[in-house]
Amino acid sequence: MKKILLIILLSIIMINAQTPTAKSILEKIDENMVSENQVVVSKMVIHGRRRSRTIKSKSWSVGDSKNFTEYLSPAREQGTKMLKIDDNLWIYTPSTDRIIKISGHMLKQSVMGSDLSYEDMMESGELTDSYDAKVVGSGEIDERDCWIINLNGKVSDLAYQKRKIWVDKTKYVPLREELYAKSGKLLKRMDLENIVKIDGRWYPTKMIFKDMLKSG
């Protein structure tokens, strides 16, 4: 009986030793996903009911507080610019030659007709600064072993107070995120794909964003 009990205790100790803490996982995610300065050329494909369209842009970021984005194509969006400084966001549209500050309820509006809102774009910074985390299980995304982690906001100014993330156990990059309302209702889901190494960091080069409240 003592031998069996000893084996069980040793097994529990080994399992605990192999599973890092939720906080240490978040710290490694932040190391991969957050950089001091970056330049990103991106392509956003928006799938509508009747047609799809592609929007190209280029962004410059300084830390998590400053970001400037210029839309390059198509012609209708070309020259549109967005400037984010801390919690402030401004948009310039060449068709009206006006600068508009996006605030309040306007932050929930769609960006270029996509499922991404301005509020989503304002989300930045390190997860460890904004959320308390708990490992709730393991799973698989595209045959990659993942930790499943629940995040609960520890600051008030978050677009999503509750999140669930599936984190690659080898590369420490989220492969899926579910974003929830305070009530627990699922609002949006993001799948992160094509993970590549850039300057020693693992980073997703494709993100699929879906509003779960929309049908189809």
Regions found by a protein language model. Name each.
Residues 114-152:
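Short, conserved active-site entrance elements at the starts or edges of catalytic domains
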Residues 12-20:
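Bacterial Sec-dependent signal peptides at the C-terminal "C-region" and cleavage site
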Residues 45, 62-64, 72-74, 87-88, ...:
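Solvent-exposed coil/turn segments that connect beta secondary-structure elements
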Residues 4-13:
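Sec-dependent N-terminal signal peptides
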Residues 94-122:
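Acidic/charged, solvent-exposed loop-and-adjacent secondary-structure segments enriched in E/D, K/R, S/T
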Residues 98, 102, 122-124, 144-216:
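Gly/Pro-enriched, hydrophobic low-complexity segments
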Residues 20-95:
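N-terminal mature ectodomain segment of secretory-pathway/periplasmic proteins
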